[in-house]
Curated annotation (Swiss-Prot):
Pathway(s) the chain acts in: Cofactor biosynthesis; biotin biosynthesis
Name of the molecule in the record: Pimeloyl-[acyl-carrier protein] methyl ester esterase
Organism whose genome encodes this protein: Nitrosospira multiformis (strain ATCC 25196 / NCIMB 11849 / C 71)
Binding site for substrate: 23, 90-91, 152-156, 244
EC number: 3.1.1.85
Enzyme class: hydrolase
GO molecular function: pimelyl-[acyl-carrier protein] methyl ester esterase activity
Keyword annotations from UniProtKB, A to Z: Biotin biosynthesis, Cytoplasm, Hydrolase, Serine esterase
Hydrolase among keywords: yes
Main location: cytoplasm
Subunit structure: Monomer.
Compartments it resides in: Cytoplasm
Similarity-based family: Belongs to the AB hydrolase superfamily. Carboxylesterase BioH family.
Length: 263
C-alpha cells in the first residue's frame, strides 16, 4: 500500500507561497489571512504529517538530534512547488529553515513567523522554555487533548493586546478539523525538544524575513533579535503588543510585510 500524500490546499494566482503551520495545529489556523494572501500569491497551505487533513499521512519518524525529522522534511519536499517562498509559523518556521538549506534551488525566500532556533532553554540559550514544562504539557495532551489544547491556545495569545478577540477565533479554527494523530504529536514533541538550529542559520543564503510579536511567550522576542544577527540577508518586523499569532492579531501588518518582501 502506497504512502498517503500530504493534504495541500492551493488557491490564488501569482508567485508561489507555501504556508507551514506549527505543532499540533493545521493549515486552517491561518484563518482569514489565507484569502487575503491569495489575492497576491498562488498559495499552498500544507497540513503536516498526521495533522488536519493529513491525518493518514504516516508513518512519522522521530526527531533527529539537532535537526527537524528527516521524514517531515522529505514529505514536504514532495509537495513543494519550484521557485517558491516558504512562510513557516513556530515549528513550521524551523521546517522552513531546513527546507531552505536542503532545497536552495527551489526555495527563493523564507519568512519565519514566531520562530526560534530552539524552543527549549539550554545551558547557553536562555530564551526558551523549560524542558520539564514541555514534557508535562505533552503528558497532559495525551490524557486530555481538548482541555490541554485550549490551555495551549491561551498561552499562544498571552501578551497580545487583543487576546480576548483572538482566543475564541483560534479555538473555532482549531476544532474545525480532527485532532492530530497521537504519533504525530509525539514526533512533533521530540522535534521541539531536540531541535537546536543555531549553528545552521549562517548557512542560509536566501533572503529571510522575521515576523515576531514583541510579547511572544513561546518564541521569545530576544530569540528573533538574536537570529537577526545570524542570517546573511535578513529583515525583522517586530510587532508591538503582539503575541505568538501575529497573522490573527495584526493580519493587515502581517500581510503587508509579506507582500512587500515576497512579491
Amino acid at each position: 500500500m502506497g504512502q498517503v500524500s500530504l493534504y495541500v490546499e492551493s488557491l490564488g494566482e501569482g508567485p508561489d507561497l507555501v504556508l507551514l503551520h506549527g505543532w499540533a495545529m493545521h493549515s486552517g489556523m491561518w484563518g482569514s489571512t489565507r484569502r487575503s494572501l491569495a489575492q497576491h500569491f498562488r498559495l499552498h497551505l500544507v497540513d503536516l504529517p498526521g495533522h488536519g487533513f493529513s491525518r493518514g499521512a504516516l508513518p512519522y519518524k522521530r526527531g533527529e538530534k539537532n535537526g527537524v525529522s528527516e521524514d517531515m522534511v522529505e514529505r514536504v519536499v514532495e509537495v513543494l512547488p519550484p521557485d517558491c517562498v516558504i512562510c513557516g509559523w513556530s515549528l513550521g518556521g524551523q521546517l522552513a529553515i531546513e527546507l531552505a538549506l536542503r532545497e536552495p534551488a527551489r526555495v527563493e525566500k523564507i519568512i519565519l513567523t514566531s520562530t526560534t532556533p530552539s524552543f527549549v532553554k539550554r545551558e547557553d540559550w536562555q530564551w526558551g522554555m523549560e524542558e520539564l514544562t514541555l514534557k508535562a504539557f505533552a503528558e497532559n495532551l495525551r490524557r486530555d487533548f481538548s482541555t490541554t489544547m485550549k490551555r495551549f491556545l491561551t498561552l499562544q495569545v498571552s501578551g497580545g493586546g487583543d487576546a480576548g478577540k483572538v482566543l475564541p477565533e483560534m479555538r473555532r479554527l482549531l476544532f474545525e478539523r480532527s485532532a492530530p494523530e497521537p504519533e504525530a504529536l509525539e514526533a512533533g514533541l521530540q522535534i521541539v525538544l531536540a531541535n537546536d538550529l543555531r549553528g545552521k542559520l549562517r548557512n542560509i543564503v536566501q533572503p529571510t524575513l522575521l515576523i515576531h510579536g514583541e510579547n511572544d511567550v513561546i518564541a521569545h522576542p530576544e530569540a528573533a533579535a538574536w537570529m537577526k544577527q545570524q542570517f546573511q540577508d535578513v529583515e525583522l518586523a517586530m510587532l508591538p503588543n503582539c503575541s505568538h499569532v501575529p497573522f490573527l492579531s495584526y493580519p493587515d501588518k502581517f500581510i503587508a510585510n509579506i507582500v512587500r518582501f515576497a512579491r
